Amino acid sequence: MTQAAASAGSELSTPPPAGRRPVLVLLLGALTALAPLSIDMYLPALPRMSADLSTGAVQAQLTLTACVVGLAAGQAVAGPLSDRLGRRRPLLAGLAAYAVASLLCVAAPTVETLIALRLVQGAAGAAGIVIARAIVRDLYDGAAAARFFSVLMLVNGLAPILAPVLGGQLLRIVPWPGVFAVLTAIGVALFLGSLLGLAETLPPGRRETGGPRATAAACRALVRDRAFTGYGLAIGLSFAAMFTYISGSPFVLQDIYGMSPQGFSIAFGVNSLGIVAAGQAGALLAGRVALTRLLAAGLAVVAAGGAVLLAAVLAGWGLHGVLPGLFLVAAGQGLVGPNATALALEGRPPRVAGTASALLGVAQFALGGAAAPLAGVAGPGTAVPMAVTIAALAVLAAAVAAAVAGAPKAVAPR
């Protein structure tokens, strides 16, 4: 263990007793699931929403992009705030705002209004995602953190399995705004669960007290840290490949390959099972296999999926080639996310865990939001842009991670 890691480890809060750990896992897993819930439950409704609001595929995809941009921007605010104010207050404020924004989405009269509200919804929900990661870092480090992140992947992974299935079934009985009514209820439930079941993990004596200048200094130190930036970019590029699939596949699979909304939701759920399975394999291997090797394996799976997808689209293999490629792209995320996050946060003191978590989230969702519209640039009749974008991003993620493997870590200044 490095001196930095040892120093950071001495600042860890006491983990909850074994009997309370399942409650912590469920709450934090549900909080990190706000992103897939906000995005994936809505996916089967995209073509119908596009028709109802008389808008094109690119504008419809912007309702996804706006949510992702909000998720990135909100993390940049909520993470540093949680370093100064503690974890609970910013978390509860964000969840309350998320519920209100989701309710307003139900009555959005135009696609422009919906885009704006989705931006707010994403920014509010970001508090849950960034603070959940910071709480894990408050309590765990290194392989222990990687194992906990992988366990969260099990809970988090259920969201992309269930969300599109629930969304597809909802569309059988309600119009597309009904999806946002369900998201409103989820926001209220998470607010109450966090209020009653989540203790403060960053006591006043361990908080950042230097104000905005200290936060800016911590950001500069982290960005200049080759290991942190490299692993953060690897997470961001890999997620961008995944989000290109998320935003492009409703149109590609339903409009080009003729899948029904229900068939699409089932295929999406199967791919999400791959994320869960890979994440649990990573949890079993963490501590016995180096985290860098687990990350490399995940990135290799994502890159292989991108290659299969591109070949299938260019060669005209149809769903028999497209679906396996998308499955590999998704499954690899189960190894990439937990291990890259643990490597990036390893040895960082809890007083900057929120800021570090925010920077990782900004990279992840900003790159994802930028990549998403590329899937539809050539119009609704071709899957080539989606396949090319996914393959290129997967290769870039693997190259960045390989370049920083073994790089020394620095600690943000006081």
Protein language model regions, located:
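Helix-loop-helix hairpin linking two adjacent transmembrane segments in secondary transporters
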Residues: P109, T113, D141-A144, S150-L196
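A late C-terminal transmembrane helix in Major Facilitator Superfamily
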Residues: L343-T382, I390
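Helix-breaking motifs and short loop linkers at transmembrane-helix boundaries and internal kinks
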Residues: D52-S54, G86, A107-T113, A124, ...
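C-terminal membrane-cytosol helix-exit motif in multi-pass small-molecule transporters
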Residues: A185-R206, V400-V404
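Juxtamembrane intracellular "pre-TM" segments in multi-pass secondary transporters
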Residues: S10-A18, T201-G232
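Cytoplasmic helix-loop-helix junction between adjacent transmembrane helices
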Residues: L117-L158
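Paired small-residue
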Residues: A97, A101-L104, E112-Q121, H320-L328
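Conserved MFS/SLC helix-loop-helix module at the cytosolic interface between two early adjacent transmembrane helices
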Residues: A73-E112
